[in-house]
From Swiss-Prot:
Role: Transcriptional regulator which functions as a general RNA polymerase II transcription inhibitor. Core component of the 7SK RNP complex: in cooperation with 7SK snRNA sequesters P-TEFb in a large inactive 7SK snRNP complex preventing RNA polymerase II phosphorylation and subsequent transcriptional elongation. Plays a role in the regulation of DNA virus-mediated innate immune response by assembling into the HDP-RNP complex, a complex that serves as a platform for IRF3 phosphorylation and subsequent innate immune response activation through the cGAS-STING pathway.
Protein name: Protein HEXIM1
Coiled coil: 213-284
GO molecular-function terms, A-Z: 7SK snRNA binding; cyclin-dependent protein serine/threonine kinase inhibitor activity
Localization: Nucleus; Cytoplasm
Amino acid composition bias (Basic and acidic residues), ranges on this chain: 23-36
Length: 285
């Protein structure tokens, strides 16, 4: 068999026609053949081919690569984190913080209710426990129970016949209730309530002092000193007034005693005149 020859220009992708000047034909691109296994050689060949075909793309790629390298060297600036909302459990809040929180919640609820009413949406009643506090604080409890009846008057009442006839078991129960439903007498119950009030007040005062800062404690101490000095001045002023009014009080007491003596004399004179009038009436026919 005869061997078939292949034209080198056709094998390289060329054309059999000669290129014309000023036409749309260009010189064939010379391509270099590289082994398949060498990846670096293949990439270099592609770079050369792309540079030969479009040199502007290579320049642009190199400039972009330089920009990325420069950007990678720069330090990444992080945005400053916003102040996080400091949350504290409700049981650890102070009295002032609890009051501010409740005021904010009530204002927010009122604002939302106003917006919903303006939009014509139905609004549920505002959930609050203020009515419970109002019912609780309507009047302060009476910490002074009524005085207990004296034990000396009880035997006299028992000896009275009218008391024996009218007394019933209900009256005795009422007397026991007046003496104290908890088994304590009037004075004992009053002492207990006074002691309990003092302990509660001292505990609350100690807790309030613990919650105060150093500056607040100093301020409170200075205020107490001012109050103490003012009370001492007032006490001294009252003492001077009492000493000044003592002679007038003594004079008033002596005048009262003199009037009492004159009253006794007038009573005796009246009795004497009554007796004389009776005798004159008896002697007359």
């Amino acid at each position: 068999m005869s061997e078939v020859g292949i034209c080198k220009s056709l094998a390289g992708g060329g054309s059999l026609l000669a290129p014309k000047e000023g036409g749309g034909w260009h010189h064939p691109v010379e391509r270099e053949e590289h082994p398949v296994g060498d990846a670096n050689t293949v990439s270099e060949g592609h770079d050369k081919e792309s540079a030969y075909q479009n040199p502007g793309q290579l320049v642009k790629a190199e400039a972009q690569e330089d920009d990325w390298k420069e950007l990678g060297k720069k330090r990444h600036r992080r945005l400053r984190s916003k102040n996080k909302r400091r949350w504290k459990p409700y049981d650890k809040l102070t009295w002032e913080e609890k009051k501010e929180l409740e005021e904010r919640q009530s204002q927010r609820a009122s604002r939302i209710r106003a917006e919903m009413i303006a939009k014509g949406q139905p609004v549920a009643p505002y959930n609050t426990t203020q009515f419970l506090m109002e019912d609780h604080d309507q009047e302060e409890p009476d910490l002074c129970p009524p005085p207990r009846k004296s034990s000396a008057a009880l035997p006299l009442a028992l000896n009275n016949s009218s008391y024996k006839g009218d007394s019933t078991d209900d009256d005795l129960e009422e007397e026991e209730d007046e003496a104290g439903s908890d088994g304590m007498g009037g004075y004992d119950g009053e002492d207990f309530l006074q002691k309990d009030f003092s302990e509660t007040y001292e505990r609350y005062h100690a807790e309030s002092l613990q919650d105060m800062s150093k500056q607040d404690l100093i301020k409170e101490y200075l205020e107490l000193e001012k109050c103490l000095s003012r009370m001492e001045e007032e006490n001294n002023h009252l003492r001077v007034q009492s000493l000044a009014s003592a002679p007038a009080a003594d004079h008033r007491d002596t005048r009262i005693q003199e009037l009492q003596v004159e009253l006794e004399k007038l009573k005796e004179e009246n009795q004497r005149l009554l007796q004389e009038g009776k005798q004159v009436a008896a002697d007359s026919p």
